[in-house]
Curated annotation (Swiss-Prot):
It is an enzyme of class 4 (lyase). Keywords: Amino-acid biosynthesis, Cytoplasm, Histidine biosynthesis, Lyase. Belongs to the imidazoleglycerol-phosphate dehydratase family. This is Imidazoleglycerol-phosphate dehydratase. One of its GO terms (biological process) is L-histidine biosynthetic process. It comes from Novosphingobium aromaticivorans (strain ATCC 700278 / DSM 12444 / CCUG 56034 / CIP 105152 / NBRC 16084 / F199). GO terms for cellular component: cytoplasm. It is found in: Cytoplasm. Its EC number is 4.2.1.19. The keyword Lyase applies.
């Protein structure tokens, strides 16, 4: 089993995250932000990564620190679980429809974190969550997990459908990328022999 566990405590947040990359998509998520919980649960369910994520953050200030730090800890746990990355497929991509909305996600577990974000929202909030924080969440998980990540909202009119399609697309792309290729189970998927740098 490929598992990772991270605890992270600062003056702003207190976080415990654990993941099992070879799971079935079970989750226990409590960030204190209901909409963010819903999105992380979608990521777990559709990636088949088991996730436990508990965050106590300074929500009396705003949601920024909780959103950012949850993504950092989750990315670190995924990176830890991937280890030397031997045998992984490495790349994943998907088109993800959610009713009238369609998004495209492509990623490379390269060790070189990059986020290209092409998505916009017509509302400042979804539930109690600021929509500007979604890009920051993906930026943070990309950095912490070492993922090159391209996200595009191709079209859609419902803000909830757009972001849920993005999270589900990210999940399905990750599911493909972390899968073990039995033909190369003992090899790092790079001609350099390492991923990163």
């Amino acid at each position: 089993m490929r598992t990772g566990s991270i605890t992270r405590k600062t003056e702003e947040t207190d976080i415990a995250v654990s993941v099992n990359l070879d799971g079935t998509g079970t989750y226990k998520v409590d960030t204190g932000i209901g909409f963010l919980d819903h999105m992380i649960e979608q990521f777990s369910r559709h990636s088949l990564i088991d996730i436990e994520c508990r965050v106590k953050g300074d929500l009396h200030v705003d949601q920024h620190h909780t959103t950012e730090d949850s993504a950092i800890a989750l990315g670190q746990a995924i990176s830890q679980a991937l280890g030397d990355k031997k045998g992984i497929t490495r790349y994943g991509h998907t088109y993800s429809p959610m009713d009238e909305a369609l998004c495209r996600v492509a990623l490379d577990i390269s060790g070189r974190p990059v986020l290209v974000w092409k998505a916009a929202f017509t509302q400042p909030r979804l539930g109690e969550m600021d929509t500007e924080l979604f890009e920051h969440w993906f930026q943070s998980i990309s950095q912490a997990a070492g993922i090159t990540l391209h996200i595009e909202s191709l079209y859609g009119s419902n803000n909830h459908h757009i972001i849920e399609g993005i999270y589900k697309g990210f999940a399905r792309a990750m599911r493909a990328a972390i899968a073990i290729d039995p033909r190369k189970a003992d090899a790092v998927p790079s001609t350099k022999g390492i991923l990163g740098g």
